[in-house]
Each structure stands twice: as C-alpha cells, then as structure tokens.
Amino acid sequence: MKESSLKLAKKVTVSEITNKISSAKAIAFAEYRGLTVAQLKEMRVEAKKVGVELKVYKNRLFKLATDKLGYDLSSFLVGANIFAFSNDDDMSAAKLLVKFAKKHKEFVVLKAGTFEGKVVDTQELKKVAALPSYEEALTILARSLMAPLQQLSLGLKLVSEQKSN
C-alpha cells in the first residue's frame, strides 16, 4: 500500500526539523500573534544578521521531531510558534527572540528552547540571552587581566618618580 503524498511530506518535514535541531547549537521559540508582515520581515532581517534561522512549523510535527531526539517540549508547543535555530553560538537565538519580545510585548510571547543540550523554560531563556557573547566575554576577560597590570605599572612609575626626586 502506497503512502499518501501528504503523509510523505509530513515525514520529510519531520526529518528536516530533526536535522535542524541536531545541527543547531541552540534553539529558542516564541508564540507570535498579530505581527504585521513588516514586523516579521524586520525579525527575519535581524535573524539573518546574527546567523539565526527562523522557521514556522506545525507544533505536532515539531513535537514528533523533538520526541525523536529526547527533548520534552510538548507543554510549550501551543499556539502559533516561530522557531529560531542558532548554528553559530549558543545564545544568538535566545538573544534575538528576547530582544524582539521586549520590543513587541503584545505580539510575542517567549516559550522555551534548548541550551547546551537541555530544555530551558522562559526564565532560563532570558538568563541565556543576558549572557555575554563569546567576543564580549573575551573583552571582559582581557579588561580584567589588564587592570592589575596597569595598576602595577602606575605604582612602579610613582615609586621611580619618588626615588628620582
């Protein structure tokens, strides 16, 4: 007995979602309702800038894919959701959706995501978004390492000036 083309299309979509989740470093998703086309376009442009891929899937198909991979996201998969897949780093997807949810509070509701292979809820998603990026963390580290050296240098300079006087 042959499978219907609709059933085959659904299997292909589930396979696509499974591949996207497997290859993504992190995922975040939010419920969106009432957004204008211009607002969605703005979100997609912003996503492209930060290396995040946005997709809209049926919740049931997304649930089938996440169940295959061992993620229990079923309680969050209600309403019209937009899924953000971050392939470059662990925080871009969360940062994008948190930023957009703040800007459009009445239209976007953060749901959940994955971070370091674990399911995270809305509160944890916000915490992930607040973390500095890799480059920002390196800058903070460099500054904190330079401060004591600068103070030592200044102290030695003052001591040498006092001895010369």
Curated annotation (Swiss-Prot):
GO biological process, one term: translation
SUPFAM superfamilies in the cross-refs: Ribosomal protein L10-like
Keyword rRNA-binding: yes
Keyword rRNA-binding: yes
One GO term describing the cellular component: ribonucleoprotein complex
InterPro entries named in the record: Ribosomal_uL10 (IPR001790), Ribosomal_uL10-like_sf (IPR043141), Ribosomal_uL10_bac (IPR022973), Ribosomal_uL10_bac_type (IPR047865)
Keywords: Ribonucleoprotein, Ribosomal protein, RNA-binding, rRNA-binding
Pfam families named in the record: Ribosomal_L10
Any GO MF annotation of the entry: large ribosomal subunit rRNA binding
NCBIfam families: PRK00099.1-1 (NF000955)
Its job: Forms part of the ribosomal stalk, playing a central role in the interaction of the ribosome with GTP-bound translation factors.
Subunit structure of this chain's protein: Part of the ribosomal stalk of the 50S ribosomal subunit. The N-terminus interacts with L11 and the large rRNA to form the base of the stalk. The C-terminus forms an elongated spine to which L12 dimers bind in a sequential fashion forming a multimeric L10(L12)X complex.
HAMAP family: Ribosomal_uL10
Family from the record: Belongs to the universal ribosomal protein uL10 family.
Name of the protein this chain belongs to: Large ribosomal subunit protein uL10
